[in-house]
Design a protein with these regions (language model features):
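Catalytic cores of the polymerase beta-like nucleotidyltransferase superfamily
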Residues: 1-322, 327
Length: 327
């Protein structure tokens, strides 16, 4: 895993990152309690791998780590503004962490910190935290993990635990469980969306070993073999096209080869379908029309819809995504 520490935070972003770090330290040191679904639980009760909370507090041994993931990290490195942060937690669900965050912001401990005084000085009219929304896991709407959402200091934050996914048979919806940063990074769509900002070390983490390279060289690449990434969720095929057209990036040759592969060994398509043919079928049969349509709409309403159409044509997906126009 490679890392860099040259990201430039705004003052407000610095407040958010310091706050997330402080909450993790506070939970480890104090073992606070919160009410979850009508029952009171301590941090140790809820935290996966909480045996470390039996030990005296040490900043290097916090059990719950917080990382900002995905689009915000990518956009910061590209010098683009972003006010939506996805926070990944190592050992609490998103909703549990959000409840502890709210409890910390309302505690005497926080009110006495330097951070609280700086926030009061520079952001006097911003509420510390808004209402916490809980979005339950809902496979019907492609929400595979429970997520919490709230507004903190003017930023929209989504909280979810690091995850790994196991897909079974023809079902697109995976079985989910807690994972490592590597598990989580490798399950994402493309490498430039798989970067993390570790709020405890103030550094970018590149667990795929390709994200920073691909960001600097303008490459759309999947963390895993393209066939594996696309089989897990075929909609990622269209996302690759969209991000390529949005940023002017080149689609990696492995993706092009995967999507344009023909039937092997001279066999007929019916008896020996190629990977590309299987992926086209999966995109049509495993992805809802709603998700499909949203992705196509984002392509065509983006900054370079012509490039998106060129890319779709290059991988023979135009008729699949725009049948009415093509006919």
């Amino acid at each position: 895993m490679s890392s860099v520490s040259n990201i430039q935070l705004t003052r407000e972003e610095g407040f958010i990152c310091t706050l997330l770090d402080d909450v993790c330290h506070w939970m480890q040191a104090s073992n606070p309690s919160v009410e979850v679904d009508g029952q009171v639980h301590t941090y140790k009760d809820l935290c996966i791998g909480s045996d470390a909370s039996d030990q005296p507090f040490s900043a290097s041994k916090i059990t719950c780590e917080a990382r900002i993931a995905g689009g915000w990290v990518r956009d910061k490195l590209l010098g683009l503004p972003s006010h939506d942060l996805d926070v990944s937690l190592s050992s609490l669900t998103g909703h549990q962490f959000a409840l502890f965050l709210k409890a910390y912001l309302e505690s005497d401990r926080f009110s006495q910190t330097k951070l609280a005084h700086e926030i009061a000085m520079h952001l006097p009219h911003r509420g510390a935290i808004g209402t916490i929304g809980k979005i339950a896991a809902n496979p019907e709407q492609s929400k595979n993990l429970e997520t919490a959402t709230t507004n903190v200091l003017g930023f929209d934050l989504d909280f979810v635990n690091l995850r790994k996914e196991v897909y079974e048979g023809t079902h697109r919806i995976p079985v989910m469980s807690f994972g490592t940063p590597l598990d989580d990074a490798m399950r994402r769509d493309i490498t430039v969306n798989a970067l993390f900002y570790n709020v405890h070390t103030a550094s970018i983490e590149d667990w795929t070993e390709h994200g920073l390279h691909d960001l600097h060289h303008g490459i759309v690449r999947t963390p895993l073999d393209p066939a594996s990434t696309f089989n897990d969720d075929p909609l990622r095929i269209l996302r690759c096209v969209r991000f390529s057209s949005r940023f002017g990036y080149e689609i990696h040759s492995d993706i092009r080869s995967c999507l344009c592969e023909t039937a092997s060994d001279g066999g007929s398509k019916a008896k020996n379908p190629s990977t590309a043919e299987l992926l086209r079928s999966a995109l049509l049969n495993k992805v809802s029309r709603e998700r499909f349509g949203i992705e196509v709409d984002k392509m065509l309403s983006g900054c370079d819809p012509f490039r998106a159409l060129q890319l779709l044509s290059a991988v023979s997906y135009t008729h699949l995504t725009l049948p009415t126009i093509c006919s």
